[in-house]
């Protein structure tokens, strides 16, 4: 149980997928202008990321490893993720049109979100079992959502203040992203302390 708590805390704060591992930068910068849109994107990513990790883990263990096709991992995972996003989009459109309308614009963007592919590969590299993979994927999605929503809040506040001409646009956005990254660096070493505390070291 403690091992899963460690994975959960580490994935959200210590090794945040965006601010520490620099995956998913495109949606982080592109969909973070408003809190509403960032929450919608976060929900869509959480759903697809968790589902994609389960499917890609099963593909790796029961297809690629069994038939010695590990060299096809990246292309296989990309195809699985793209197919999964399309399937989710079709199902949502039929089952829940309201939810489809809310997330519709974000779902196609998830296919190109490198964080989804990155997490799928990371769980294989870390040799996680299926439950650990699910916990890691969901925790990573929460970490992504947290970073995205906090950053959207910062950008909304920046709209209310007068920024010097030379710092307007992407300059202040990149500076704010850097400061947010530095804030999350304050969590570095927490996972090591928790390992000792939980007796996992």
Predicted ranges, named:
Residues 61-104:
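Ordered, amphipathic secondary-structure segments that act as subunit-interaction surfaces
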């Amino acid at each position: 149980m403690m091992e899963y708590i460690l994975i959960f805390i580490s994935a959200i704060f210590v090794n945040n997928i965006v601010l520490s591992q620099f995956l998913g930068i495109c949606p982080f910068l592109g969909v973070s202008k408003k809190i509403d849109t960032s929450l919608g994107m976060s929900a869509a990513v959480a759903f697809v990321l968790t589902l994609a990790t389960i499917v890609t883990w099963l593909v790796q263990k029961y297809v690629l490893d069994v038939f010695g096709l590990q060299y096809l991992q990246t292309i296989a995972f990309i195809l699985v993720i793209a197919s999964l996003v399309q399937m989710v989009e079709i199902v949502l459109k039929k089952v829940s049109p309201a939810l489809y309308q809310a997330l519709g614009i974000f779902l196609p963007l998830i296919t190109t979100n490198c964080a989804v592919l990155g997490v799928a590969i990371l769980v294989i590299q870390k040799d996680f079992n299926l439950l650990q993979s699910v916990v890691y994927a969901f925790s990573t999605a929460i970490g992504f959502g947290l970073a995205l929503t906090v950053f959207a809040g910062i950008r909304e506040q920046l709209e209310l203040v007068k920024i010097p001409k030379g710092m307007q646009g992407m300059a202040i956005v990149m500076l704010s992203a850097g400061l947010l990254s530095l804030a999350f660096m304050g969590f570095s070493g927490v996972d090591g302390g928790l390992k000792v505390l939980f007796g996992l070291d």
